[in-house]
Swiss-Prot record:
Keyword annotations of the record: Ribonucleoprotein, Ribosomal protein
Organism the protein comes from: Bdellovibrio bacteriovorus (strain ATCC 15356 / DSM 50701 / NCIMB 9529 / HD100)
Name this protein carries in UniProt: Small ribosomal subunit protein uS10
Gene Ontology, cellular component aspect: ribonucleoprotein complex; ribosome
InterPro entries: Ribosomal_uS10, Ribosomal_uS10_CS, Ribosomal_uS10_dom, Ribosomal_uS10_dom_sf
Organism domain of life: Bacteria
């Protein structure tokens, strides 16, 4: 397991929740003896939606809404079996999407 790398990508709408989950993952990985590269903030994706305020007339009167998707990336270098076990047991917030890729270095 020494020549492998774990890449973790996190996505959430709330950046505070995302930073808290990232901090928990980094602390867990460092506590088990693995090296951590990151967290690297990735570009925030902003989806904007424009809707008419009125259902009938007044085309010029519109309202805009936006959804921001914040992203972070972590690389765990030289993970041990204990690191993988602890990361599997980690209970993260429900609003955070976690994507994990395991690759050889």
């Amino acid at each position: 397991m020494q020549s492998q790398k774990i890449r973790i990508r996190l996505k959430a709408f709330d950046h505070k929740l995302l930073d808290q989950s990232t901090k928990e993952i980094v602390e867990t990985a460092r506590r088990t003896g693995a090296k951590v590269a990151g967290p690297i903030p990735l570009p925030t994706r902003i989806n904007r939606y424009t809707v008419l305020r009125s259902p009938h007339v007044d085309k010029k009167s519109r309202e805009q809404f936006e959804v921001r998707t914040h992203k972070r990336m972590l690389d765990i270098l030289e993970p041990t079996q204990q690191t993988v076990d602890q990361l599997m047991k980690l209970d993260l917030s429900a609003g955070v999407d976690v994507e994990i890729k395991l690759s050889a270095v």
